[in-house]
Structures are given as structure tokens and as C-alpha cells.
Amino acid sequence: MSALLDRLRTDLSALAGQGLRRVRRSNALPCAPRALVDGREMLAFCSNDYLGLAAEPALATALAQASSRWGAGSGASHLVSGHYAVHDALEHRLAAFVGAERALYFSTGYMANAGIVPALVGRGDAVFADRLNHASLVDGVLLSRADMHRYPHGDLAVLARQLAGSSAARKLIVTDAVFSMDGDVAPLADLLELAERHDAWLMVDDAHGFGVLGPQGRGALADAGLQHWRLIYVGTLGKAAGVSGAFAAGHGELVEWLLQKARTYIFTTGAPPALAEALLLSLDLIEAADDRRTHLAGLIERFGAELTLSRWQRLPSRTPIQPIRIGGNEEALAVARALWDEGLWVPAIRPPTVPAGSARLRVSLTAAHTEADVLRLARTLNRLEHAAHG
């Protein structure tokens, strides 16, 4: 047998031995708090479907009707023949929704981030990145071959020193808006002030804020009251929006440059036009979802108030991402298994997704959960911690 396969087997065994080997679970029901896994009914706190739109009947109907009208696929890349009138309509609607001059629709959030950064910076340029940024931003920086300066999470003093010490012709600050494993919100106004002071772009990945934060769910920049030509806003359309894809929004010339230079936009088949049509309805639903956002905010508050943890730590978060830091990989996995045995599906997040020694449960609350759901989870966590640590 090949030494290549032997090496793979050894590496896979090592992952398992460190508690780092990932396992997929197959859900036999549509995306909702109630799941069916291996024939067992579970109450799930896993998805990023923050407004409960993924299985919204009106949205499913719109997608089915759009598929009948547009067919199943686009047939080509956007810059050949895979760009349709409904893609234009979606981009205009997205730009207006977030208050930008123009928007560009990408197939996924990962592709947006991996394409935008290399389109803006390259060798000899400098990128300044929060250490807890999403992997797609990290990969975008690596692909760009620009010099990467990572600053400790939220440490603006270090960032300011890094910016002041850089002689790069082009500078780019990149940050999550809502950090995906911590749930906290970046200090966007302060970051923009630093970007202005040092003549840098500021790229904000609002994967977990779009649809949830700000007036009518218009996102983290709207929540902070920020608009500026140097802002590059990235929103995800497969989380709160309930469908699929992502978009970049900003100054018109910036977006035109991305259209010309973002390789993950140029060299891939365009997203099906039916998805774009469904997303037009999704934006209407987001805009009208104040009741859902109010309900979700209430669940977040109720969950925090009900927890009485002393050893495990709930990280402070006003967003639907409610992390419970456990510590070691094996203990986090054991807690997730204990919850699973009680019919509660909560993922254990381990390195390299989070720093070593900070393995955690990533609780995701959605507007489709009930107060009873949230209380059940909180009380079970309280009981499990007491049983484990007294």
C-alpha cells in the first residue's frame, strides 16, 4: 500500500486521538429547531437560520416558482452568459437595502471573502486582521500574498501601532462584524476612524449580523450608523436570509473593480437565477421581520438570565451566537454528547476553529425557537455542570 495512504491514516488517527476529528450528522427534516437524526428527534441549537426563514413556506414557494420560470442553473459564469436580469434586480435591491451605491452577488460567503481581498491588495501591500476573523478572511489574505499583520482580538491600540508602522502603499483592515465563535460585535466606528487616519480600506464581514442587527435587519454598519466610501461590506445570504450566497457592497467604482478582478466571481458558474428571485422575497421578509427580531432578542436575554454556570463560561454576547466556553477538547465533546443524550443538539467547537484551551459549545438561537426550548437548554446545562463539577 502507498506511503501516501499510510500517512493519511496516521494523520486521521492523530486527529481522532486529539478529539479533533469531525463527524457529519444527517438531518432528515427541513432546517428548523426540530431535527430528525438517525431516526431520533432532536431539538437543535446549531443553525445560523437566525430569523427562521430557511423553511418559511412563502420562501419555499417562491423558490419553486422561480425554478419553474428560470430553470435549475445559470449555465455559465456571470461574465459569459450566466448573468440574468434577476441577478441585476437582486444586486440593486441589496445595495439599496444596506445603503450602498452598488452590490455584487457571490455564490457563497467564503468565495466572497476569498476573492475580495486578493482583488484589493497584493505583494507589498499590508492587511491588518483581527486574530479571531473567520477562516475565509484568513484564506483571502493568504491568497493575496500581501503582508498580514494580525492584532489581538479587539485590541485597537495594537492595531493603531501596526498601521502607524506600515509603509505599504495600500492598506486593508479586515474584520468580522459579529465574531462567529464568540458572538461579540467589532468596534466598527473605531475601526473606521483608524482606517481614515491611516488611509486604509475597511472590509467588514457581516455574515452573522445581516438580517439581525440594525434597523429592519440592515446589518452591523446600519446598527452603528456608519457609511463611508472606504467601507467594503460583505453580507451573507444563507444565514438570516435563509437562502444561499453572499454579496459585497460599497462605492460604485470599488464594486466595479471587484467585478473585474475578484477571481472567485469571474471563474465560477453563476448562482442559479432562481436563488436570486427567492432572495428578493427574502429581503422583503427581513425588512418586515421586526417581530421575529424582537422575539429573538427576548430569547437571548432569557437564556443568559437562566444560566447559573460557575465553572463553564457564557461569553458576553447580544447576538444569537451564545458560546459556552468549556476548556478542554474532550470535556467539550463530553458535554455535547451528554446534551445529545438528552435530545439537545449543540455542537462542540474545538481547535483550530477556536484557540487551544478554549473549546466550547456554540449555541445558536433563532426566532423559530420558543422560550420553552431555550429554558430547557439552559436548565440542562446548569444541571450537567453541577453534576460534572459540583
UniProtKB/Swiss-Prot annotation:
Q: State the needed cofactors, names only.
A: pyridoxal 5'-phosphate
The catalysed reaction is:
6-carboxyhexanoyl-[ACP] + L-alanine + H(+) = (8S)-8-amino-7-oxononanoate + holo-[ACP] + CO2
- EC no.? 2.3.1.47
Q: Where does pyridoxal 5'-phosphate bind?
A: 109-110, 180, 208, 236
Q: In which pathway does it act?
A: Cofactor biosynthesis; biotin biosynthesis
> Can the keyword Transferase be found in this entry's annotation?
yes
Give the highest taxon in the source lineage: Bacteria
Function statement:
Catalyzes the decarboxylative condensation of pimeloyl-[acyl-carrier protein] and L-alanine to produce 8-amino-7-oxononanoate (AON), [acyl-carrier protein], and carbon dioxide.
Q: Name one Pfam family in it.
A: Aminotran_1_2
HAMAP family cross-referenced by the UniProt entry: BioF_aminotrans_2
> Where along this sequence does the record place binding of substrate?
22, 134, 353
Biological process annotations from GO: biotin biosynthetic process
Protein name stated in the entry: 8-amino-7-oxononanoate synthase
What subunit structure does UniProt give?
Homodimer.
Which EC class, in a word?
transferase
